[in-house]
Regions:
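N-terminal beta-strand motif that seeds the catalytic metal site of vicinal oxygen chelate
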Residues: 1-17, 69-76, 116-120
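Vicinal oxygen chelate
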Residues: 1, 25-71, 83-108, 118-120
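Amphipathic alpha-helical segments
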Residues: 11-26, 86-88
Length: 120
């Protein structure tokens, strides 16, 4: 049995490969329409599922546009190098940055996610 959070994407395998590289977590399972990052026993898996008619969310949220349903927050030690790595892997930096110790990025499928500096 596994527990997970499912994220919709136009190409689940590609998005799983992005997060696999970003997090250093291998892909545990992949089949047409679904990819799952391997999770240590007892941890929550991240599941990527193909969605017909997928529409990427807009950040920041805007009236009449697809709103983000959820987002990931990842704690990092060195914010600048973590952002540079995410950009090299295919993320983009969001224009709207609401906090100094957090960077909002957009993954290759258009989902916002945050890299949060670990201030101890």
């Amino acid at each position: 049995m596994w527990w997970g959070t499912a994220i919709e994407a136009p190409d689940p395998g590609a998005l799983a490969r992005f997060y696999s590289a970003l997090l250093g977590t291998p892909i545990g399972h992949e089949e047409p329409g679904t990819a799952i990052l391997a999770a240590p026993e007892g941890a929550i898996s991240i599941v990527f599922q193909k969605a017909a008619g997928y529409q990427a969310p807009v950040w920041p949220p805007a009236d009449g546009a697809q709103r983000p349903m959820m987002h990931f927050d990842f704690q990092v030690g060195d914010l600048d190098s973590a952002v540079a790595e995410a950009l090299d892997l295919g993320a983009s930096l969001a224009e709207h940055q609401p906090q100094d110790h957090v960077r909002v990025l957009i993954d290759p499928a258009g989902h916002p996610f945050c890299l949060c500096r670990d201030d101890g």
